[in-house]
């Protein structure tokens, strides 16, 4: 067990589980990253990046880079061999049992033939839900974990604790107005 936060972060970094923090506009217009990294006001709405009062502090969103975690999955021979399950091992009796049997999946495969032709291309499902970590109805604190479910894996593994990837945590004292801006780092990494 690590002795403190710094040592814990060092251990996580060594195994490819590092994270990045990004400040967000108070109106959820942009993340202050890339070209906006050094700006102090939102270019869309003009709001200051920093609040003057102590009551409304926003904690930066924590983004967990997904590419190192995908590499780790493919380094494990057992998991790497199961990444083809949706292509090679699922039943073909036209009964919908897993997402790969759905009309939406079939539509995606018809629309993007190149994506379909490579069975190692990863199909992710996005799961997110706001929670109140302190269990108080009157609390204004909001926590939004955003997870990815790997639909390439068999269904009995895809939703197991070790295979769901936490990709982003949005923390703050207020409900998020628009989640799209927070998904930009994830979408950018996976395309």
Task: Describe each region flagged by the PLM.
Residues 1-191:
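Long, charged/polar, flexible scaffold/linker tracts and peripheral helical/loop segments
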């Amino acid at each position: 067990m690590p002795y403190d936060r710094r040592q814990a972060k060092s251990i996580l970094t060594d195994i490819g589980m590092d994270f990045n923090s990004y400040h967000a506009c108070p109106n959820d217009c942009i993340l202050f990253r890339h070209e906006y990294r050094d700006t102090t006001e939102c270019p869309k709405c003009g709001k200051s990046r920093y609040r003057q009062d102590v009551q409304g502090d926003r904690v930066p969103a924590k983004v967990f880079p997904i590419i190192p975690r995908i590499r780790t999955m493919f380094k494990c021979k057992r998991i790497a061999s199961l990444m083809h399950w949706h292509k090679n091992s699922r039943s073909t009796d036209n009964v919908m049992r897993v997402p790969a049997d759905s009309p939406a999946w079939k539509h995606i495969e018809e629309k993007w033939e190149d994506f379909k032709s490579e069975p190692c291309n990863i199909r992710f499902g996005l799961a997110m839900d706001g929670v109140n970590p302190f269990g108080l109805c009157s609390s204004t604190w909001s926590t939004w974990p955003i997870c990815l479910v790997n639909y390439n894996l068999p269904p009995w593994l895809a939703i197991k604790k070790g295979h769901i990837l936490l990709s982003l945590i949005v923390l703050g004292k207020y409900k998020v107005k628009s989640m799209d801006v927070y998904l930009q780092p994830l979408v950018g990494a996976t395309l």
